Amino acid sequence: MAKTLYQKVFDAHVVREVDGETPLIYIDRHLVHEVTSPQAFDGLRAMNRPLRRPDLTWATMDHNVSTTTKDIAASGEMARIQMETLADNCKEFGVRLYDLNHKYQGIVHVMGPELGITLPGTTIVCGDSHTATHGAFGSLAFGIGTSEVEHVMATQTLKQGRAKTMRISVNGKLAEGISAKDVVLAIIGQVGHAGGTGYVVEFAGEAIAGLSMEGRMTVCNMAIELGAKAGMIAPDQTTIDYIRGKEFAPKGESLDQAIAYWLSLKSDQGAHFDAEVILDAADIAPQVTWGTNPGQVIAVNEPIPAPESFSDLMEQQSARKALAYMDLQPGQKLTDVAIDKVFIGSCTNSRIEDLRAAAAIARGRKVAAGVQALVVPGSEQVKAQAEAEGLDKIFLEAGFEWRLPGCSMCLAMNNDRLQPGERCASTSNRNFEGRQGRAGRTHLVSPAMAAAAAVTGRFADIRAL
């Protein structure tokens, strides 16, 4: 029987399946951070259980960390306790930890791929909703809750039902300057922020195949924002070239054997998908969200839609509420809207390609008066590479702040946050009410669009700069 990529990876990991029970699958990689792991370690300790596979478990500090200092106490008492607890737990249970002073520290979904921990055909879990990022490599990766974190720690397995399958194809070539972030925002705008609920999505088509691994990670990162369980992209030569030579990737003959398997991980001809969505790449323009979920998005040169333009009554109600919260009006152009802050970073857009795109806009320009602009590399590795390329100097000369790695302003869990009423052009993945700080207003954009907003003081079409 013809199988999809998702079905191939899922079936290869079934440990036990009997009628009337949810399948039990094996987990190849478990990524851990300071926020969702303490109770899980406590659970092991309470039952006197060992960590089943410390060799398949990696930990880092990212959510709570300060991006201005390596001081573990800089983000407050709770953050300090969580990070110190993670360090103690990792020492007790034998887990590799990339702490604040380690050269591999970074956002967990940036760290995993750049170290070769993330590999095609593997199952990957983490107590974080954006674990879908790793699906860019053809892995089945998804976020789990704290009780599931404990289950994986104890057994290296997880109960998982089979999801429905959706293929989203972006056909044709993208126009100059259109990024992976624009692609995925356009997808969510078409499918809706709940349109993928119950599905594992495979992203396909010429435009997806033409993306770098960084771009593919951006797309899969936001699969969760259309409601999907996970997002996946079939591995190809681009994938292999990225993985080759990474620290934890296979080497030599083992790599050759792995590549042969990885290249078999694609949906078979005639494989059935429960849903199909098709977009034309030529129709995708630079995107900006106007509301309070990622599906409330338009092209930068379009007017904000009127709530009455939505056929669904719930969507109309949601649009009215969003416009009130965001202090925007139907018909208004976002290019007329001034911003207060810019955030370039997060597990969506903090990799080297993202920083290069932002620096290309910032070069020779200055951050607009009254705007605070932060650039937060996703890891120490990304930071080092960016500095080797001189990107930090470009940002600093333009008036951006060059920060230390961490989740930063993606979520109001550290010192980087919006004040009530402040408006932010952000390269992160969620624009929910209060996501970046109480009563803060978040607009999701690409790195280039964020940099353009920083230097113009308002949303700007990068095609016109």
Swiss-Prot record:
Keywords tagged on the record: 4Fe-4S, Amino-acid biosynthesis, Branched-chain amino acid biosynthesis, Iron, Iron-sulfur, Leucine biosynthesis, Lyase, Metal-binding
Molecular functions (GO terms): 3-isopropylmalate dehydratase activity; 4 iron, 4 sulfur cluster binding; metal ion binding
Pathway, per record: Amino-acid biosynthesis; L-leucine biosynthesis; L-leucine from 3-methyl-2-oxobutanoate: step 2/4
GO terms of biological process kind: L-leucine biosynthetic process
EC number: 4.2.1.33
PROSITE patterns given in the database record: ACONITASE_1, ACONITASE_2
CDD domains (alphabetical): IPMI
Record note on quaternary structure: Heterodimer of LeuC and LeuD.
UniProt record similarity statement: Belongs to the aconitase/IPM isomerase family. LeuC type 1 subfamily.
NCBIfam families on file: leuC, PRK05478.1, PRK12466.1
UniProt function note: Catalyzes the isomerization between 2-isopropylmalate and 3-isopropylmalate, via the formation of 2-isopropylmaleate.
Protein name per UniProt: 3-isopropylmalate dehydratase large subunit
